[in-house]
Amino acid sequence: MAAYLLAVAILFCIQGWPSATVQGQVMPFMEVYERSACQTRETLVSILKEYPDEVAHLFKPSCVPVLRCSGCCSDESLKCTATGKHSVGREVMRVDPHKGTSKIEVMQFKEHTDCECRPRSPGDVNNGRNPEEGEPRARFPFV
């Protein structure tokens, strides 16, 4: 089986990765595997989650796109973790509902530049729940 997967990977490297762009087309295994790997991806981040002390204001839009680490690691004991970060500015409209005013301003957000799979710390497991999404983990995912 391992030899077969290696042969398929080599074949795709030679011919190029197929792209599942046609609606309803099945995405090939190697493309699924590559696209699900731990890497930076554009993610929408809630401004109020990044700036919880700003609850007196409204923001338009209420979330902004930034690159964040996300994806699957080869083992449940590993977690996709940011290893590099920098700050980026995003223009948003800050609305003060009490004064009836608004202004466009630049707010800073952390953007991930590099990711890798690293061992989970004991605090990463929260009673069988995924701390990033709050969704329960499947106890027997392949049964």
Curated annotation (Swiss-Prot):
Q: Which residues form the signal peptide?
A: 1-24
Q: Name one GO molecular function term.
A: vascular endothelial growth factor receptor binding
Output the CDD domains linked to this UniProt entry. Answer: PDGF
Gene Ontology biological process terms from the UniProt entry: induction of positive chemotaxis; positive regulation of angiogenesis; positive regulation of endothelial cell proliferation; positive regulation of mast cell chemotaxis; response to hypoxia; sprouting angiogenesis; vascular endothelial growth factor receptor signaling pathway; vascular endothelial growth factor signaling pathway
Gene3D superfamilies, per this entry?
A: Cystine-knot cytokines (2.10.90.10)
What is the recorded post-translational modification?
Answer: The N-terminus is blocked for N-terminal sequencing, suggesting a Pyrrolidone carboxylic acid at Gln-25.
What keywords sit in the KW lines? Disulfide bond, Growth factor, Pyrrolidone carboxylic acid, Secreted, Signal, Toxin
Compositionally skewed regions (Basic and acidic residues) per UniProt: 130-143
Q: Which cysteines are joined by disulfide bonds?
A: C38-C80, C69-C115, C73-C117
Q: Which residues carry this modification: Pyrrolidone carboxylic acid?
A: Q25
Extract one GO cellular component term from the record: membrane
Q: Which SMART domains match?
A: PDGF
Matching SUPFAM superfamilies, A to Z? Cystine-knot cytokines
Q: What InterPro entries does this protein's entry cite?
A: Cystine-knot_cytokine, PD_growth_factor_CS, PDGF/VEGF_dom, PDGF/VEGF_growth_factor
Subunit structure, interactors included: Homodimer; disulfide-linked. Interacts with VEGF receptor-2 (KDR).
Q: What does this protein do?
A: Snake venom VEGFs that may contribute to venom dispersion and prey subjugation by inducing vascular permeability and hypotension. This protein induces an increase in capillary permeability when intradermally injected into mice. Also provokes a drastic hypotensive effect after intravenous injection. The hypotension is mediated by nitric oxide (NO), which is produced by VEGF-activated endothelium NO synthase. Also induces angiogenesis in vitro.
UniProt family annotation: Belongs to the PDGF/VEGF growth factor family. Snake venom VEGF subfamily.
Q: What is this protein called?
A: Snake venom vascular endothelial growth factor toxin
Question: What is the species of this protein?
Answer: Protobothrops jerdonii (Jerdon's pitviper)
